[in-house]
Amino acid sequence: MAYVTVGTENSTDIELYYEDHGFGRPVVLIAGYVQDGSSWEKQTAALLDAGNRVITYDRRGFGKSSQPTTGHDYDTYAADLNSLFTKLDLRDTVLVGFSMGTGEVARFIGRYGSQRVAKAVFIGSLQPFMLKSEETPDGVPQEDVDSMLDAIRADRYAFFTSFFENFYNLDENLGSRISEEAVRASWQVAASSSAYASVWAPAAWYTDFRADIDKIDVPTLIMHGTGDRNVPIDLTSRQFAKALPSATYIEIEGAPHGMLWTHGEEINKALLDFLA
């Protein structure tokens, strides 16, 4: 098992678990909330078959990584990613983020530049800025964010159950595009996450990424499902595509937020076409 040390909390090292497979151009896959590198299994297989080197890692607080009570913000998440880049001496890299992982992609480029990044991919994006403000009147009100965080604190396991119902649009896709066993596996990974990170990672979703978008200067792919109930497309990717008109923008009709699994074939085709 491979780890990169990204800091310390008191007497304990903070270590991120990662996997590094295959050969060719490196593709770094960054998972969403309460998920880990295994959430990319359908994409990992397709990317390896196409001759790529595929690197996944678990965000601090999740998966097999350390569970600190510090650093649950995008400046730190981007610094963690930079530590992985440094350890593996990554260059000419394709950065691919899903959901919460799109924040690392945006903030990494915004903070560290694109010298080591060849292309960027945003799937189910949080960008540009989801929180309601004078400039974003259609955003999510702070009181709704606070209510969500309170629900996680009260019973995160019950929250995960309702979260995945909308993550996969189970009323539409259970038994056809996703099995009960796959949903259960997602829940089990979520349940293994840090109780602290389970609360504070979602607070970071409402980071303002508009300044980071201004610094994206590499070929970029933005993908989003029109059926996304967790991260509404009108508030995020459609606005993101307007803010970054040079990007390739793809909407996947009817796809839920958890489309890496439910619409894996469509995601893989778009991803491989973009990487070609």
Which residue stretches match the model-derived regions?
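Conserved alpha/beta-hydrolase catalytic His-Asp/Glu region
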Residues: P128-G139, D150-D214
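Conserved alpha/beta-hydrolase "acid-adjacent" motif
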Residues: R229-L235
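Short beta-strand/loop motif that positions the catalytic acidic residue
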Residues: I216, I222-H224, D228
